[in-house]
């Protein structure tokens, strides 16, 4: 009876699998180029929660391969816009795992198509994240990132950061195992010098982990061997991109004070002084190294006797620059205020110091890195939500040009443009015509059709503005030097009409800025939000009165009790 029952079960299961395969074959034929039958499409996302063993998967995969021609499968690329399935129905077959290296390369291939913050991530990313939920899987993902990300792809380091940032935090055992596998030291840094991608990727991984694990875990990760490895990568014999990411990794390790002291004691500042001279190098890789070296010498690894850059830079001809008081927290701005770089995992943004309300205006940007940046125009109402991935062009008060993904951004929606992908050294022009209510974008002098949609929300109060993905950098020209591709129509420049006092031009290093904040004395009756004006306003109906009128007018609910604000009453007697 048991044997008979088992035979009936096997027969029914075979029939069910046959029907399922037939159904999948018809679905695959129906979906066609939408990628239902591709390896990347629906075969690599997650594991079934049932207790079925892997042998069933193998049999099912063989049956599927015989039912669907291999050539057909390979010829149909996955539609990157189609949202992946996240859930699994009761009869849905288990998604099969792909080779880790293939998943990493698939993610790199489709990363340019991720243009919506609410868009589901690609199948490959979801699978990698699932794999990384175990120590063994996390180690496989990290080693694959080091092994297969190519040197020439401008988004390679950003993909490393993106994948590791979204993966679960590694355990202490996983970190220990990783250091044992890598076995880094000065000698390892000298090996495979003809293949710098491995060293670049290793440094990028270390930097991402240092940023993500700031604190005791970061201290434990910076072993003597890893410190020796990163310092060796800074030597002039190394490839510039290896030097760049080794320096960025050291910067991120230095976010923990104990690591900062350890790195400073290694005489790193002596090496950085040499690299600082590359800040204006015509080679754009060396220029990035020089920028980061100068920033580190000014902000992190101070050298005794060295004058800080802001104290000696000549700003006499500069009347408009990037605003160090109107910027998200992790963006690096050069001492002359015309160059910016992001090395954080967030989407950092900045506006310039000059606002325009009428007329025709133009500025240019030199592309130093060819990755994702959104550059254009924004009003004061445009919000910088760096940790949520929103920047210029992601609300109704800004419009941006994206030369990497070849898109125009407005109100968090994008549309393609006909310019080729930008590359290092390209010049992007930005024309704002407030008379005709239009914006025109140029790439090396070639213009696109005008953009007008932003003027449905605002017609004045525009600033030059930009947002940067990880490891991106560019230089702005607001008219302090001749433009490379001036437009044919008559226009004005910021530098001709703006004015900044000598004090307003100073971009202080972070340690100097913190020192000034410590000297600020706060009055007892000051506003609890701005700490500047007197707290002279009472909120009704809750009755709290710790705010000034300017701050109170910007709030809809009380910051103390969260009750809705119905009215605001100025208390004249509180003014002193």
UniProtKB/Swiss-Prot annotation:
- ZnF regions (RING-type) run across 527-562
Which N-terminal residues, if any, form the signal peptide? 1-16
Keyword set includes Hydrolase: no
GO MF assignments: ubiquitin-protein transferase activity; zinc ion binding
What keywords appear on the UniProt entry? Glycoprotein, Metal-binding, Phosphoprotein, Secreted, Signal, Zinc, Zinc-finger
Q: Which PROSITE patterns match?
A: B302_SPRY, ZF_RING_2
**Gene Ontology CC annotations of this record:** cytoplasm; extracellular region
Reply yes or no: does the keyword Kinase apply: no
Compartments where located: Secreted
Bias (Basic residues) occurs at: 83-97
This protein's major location comes to secreted
This chain belongs to the protein called: RING finger and SPRY domain-containing protein 1
Q: What organism is this sequence from?
A: Macaca fascicularis (Crab-eating macaque)
Q: Which gene is the coding source of this polypeptide chain?
A: RSPRY1
